[in-house]
């Protein structure tokens, strides 16, 4: 574990792991007061199942850069499958479940929203696409942006690259990253 920054408003951490013959990977997280950007990489010779056992209310955008994953959540029927260069948005009152990484190489970024922060964002604006989501959020019902993950919008590539490759330092770095995270909403 490498704590890069731990401030009052911003945090940044890096983790890496390696087990001979089983696989290796890394996790890079950047947290703000209301959002967390995570970049996850794993390399394994075989498919791997990850369990998320903590039932937490969460909203998350997932961006798959490489590989395939199939997810099943404890309070939803069926599975959701994400592939290379796909994206989706998901809100759930119980984010616990299992995620099966189907390929030996997996690279993804997620943007996780704090529920109270998300509620404030939703109150600030109202558009047709957000209205359906707002109803689910108000009633605490799971919401999947669309039944199937979609191809990334061209602009998303640039925004995610700007976050991942940000060369600013100190407070400027975190203000820049936070503004880019807001662009992804």
Kindly label every feature range from the protein language model:
Residues 72-185:
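Alpha-helical bundle regulatory/interaction domains
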Residues 2-107:
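N-terminal functional module of multi-domain proteins
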């Amino acid at each position: 574990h490498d704590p890069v920054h731990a401030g009052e408003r911003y945090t940044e951490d890096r983790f890496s792991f390696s087990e001979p013959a089983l696989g290796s990977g890394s996790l890079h997280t950047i947290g703000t007061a209301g959002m967390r950007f995570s970049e996850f990489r794993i390399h394994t010779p075989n498919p791997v199942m990850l369990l998320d056992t903590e039932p937490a209310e969460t909203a998350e955008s997932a961006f798959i850069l490489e590989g395939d994953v199939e997810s099943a959540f404890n309070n939803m029927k069926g599975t959701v499958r994400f592939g290379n260069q796909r994206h989706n948005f998901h809100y759930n009152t119980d984010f616990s479940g299992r995620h099966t990484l189907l390929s030996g190489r997996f690279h993804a970024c997620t943007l996780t929203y704090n529920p109270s922060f998300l509620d404030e964002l939703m109150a600030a604006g109202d558009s047709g696409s957000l209205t359906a989501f707002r109803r689910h959020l108000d009633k605490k019902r799971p919401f999947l942006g669309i039944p199937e993950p979609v191809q990334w919008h061209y602009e998303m590539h640039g925004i995610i690259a700007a976050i991942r490759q940000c060369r600013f330092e100190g407070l400027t770095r975190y203000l820049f990253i936070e503004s880019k995270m807001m662009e992804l909403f």
